């Protein structure tokens, strides 16, 4: 029983930690490409900015889904029988 709870805690930490790292890297790369594209074509800044914010929201939403799954495992663990 304690073994399962310990592994679930480890899995929750990995889900949140690796998800945060992945989302941070993704948003950083996208922001860099946005700055590069807006420097090349300044007339497209408005369209690029809109698309960048939509994609940033989608990347962040994927991370938040991972956080929700980690919270599900942490507080309503389906692997532990009551």
From Swiss-Prot:
TM annotation in the entry: 7-27, 53-73
Record key words, sorted: ATP synthesis, Cell inner membrane, Cell membrane, CF(0), Hydrogen ion transport, Ion transport, Lipid-binding, Membrane, Transmembrane, Transmembrane helix, Transport
Domain of life of the source: Bacteria
Membrane keyword on record: yes
InterPro entries per UniProt: ATP_synth_csu_bac/chlpt, ATP_synth_F0_csu, ATP_synth_F0_csu_DDCD_BS, ATP_synth_F0_csu_sf, ATPase_proteolipid_c-like_dom, F/V-ATP_Csub_sf
Residues carrying the site annotation Reversibly protonated during proton transport: 60
Cellular localization per UniProt: Cell inner membrane
Pfam families xref list: ATP-synt_C
Record has Cell membrane as a keyword: yes
Membrane topology: Multi-pass membrane protein
GO MF, one annotated term: lipid binding
GO cellular component: plasma membrane; proton-transporting ATP synthase complex; proton-transporting two-sector ATPase complex, proton-transporting domain
Chief localization: membrane
Family: Belongs to the ATPase C chain family.
Subunit structure: F-type ATPases have 2 components, F(1) - the catalytic core - and F(0) - the membrane proton channel. F(1) has five subunits: alpha(3), beta(3), gamma(1), delta(1), epsilon(1). F(0) has three main subunits: a(1), b(2) and c(10-14). The alpha and beta chains form an alternating ring which encloses part of the gamma chain. F(1) is attached to F(0) by a central stalk formed by the gamma and epsilon chains, while a peripheral stalk is formed by the delta and b chains.
General function of this protein: F(1)F(0) ATP synthase produces ATP from ADP in the presence of a proton or sodium gradient. F-type ATPases consist of two structural domains, F(1) containing the extramembraneous catalytic core and F(0) containing the membrane proton channel, linked together by a central stalk and a peripheral stalk. During catalysis, ATP synthesis in the catalytic domain of F(1) is coupled via a rotary mechanism of the central stalk subunits to proton translocation.
Protein name: ATP synthase subunit c
Organism of this sequence: Paracidovorax citrulli (strain AAC00-1) (Acidovorax citrulli)
Native organism taxonomy: Bacteria, Pseudomonadati, Pseudomonadota, Betaproteobacteria, Burkholderiales
């Amino acid at each position: 029983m304690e073994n399962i709870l310990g592994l679930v805690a480890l899995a929750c930490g990995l889900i949140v930690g690796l998800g945060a790292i992945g989302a941070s890297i993704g948003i950083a790369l996208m922001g860099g490409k946005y700055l590069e594209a807006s420097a090349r074509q300044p007339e497209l800044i408005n369209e690029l900015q809109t698309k960048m914010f939509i994609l940033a929201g989608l990347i962040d939403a994927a991370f938040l889904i991972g956080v929700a799954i980690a919270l599900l495992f942490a507080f309503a663990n389906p692997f532990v029988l009551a």
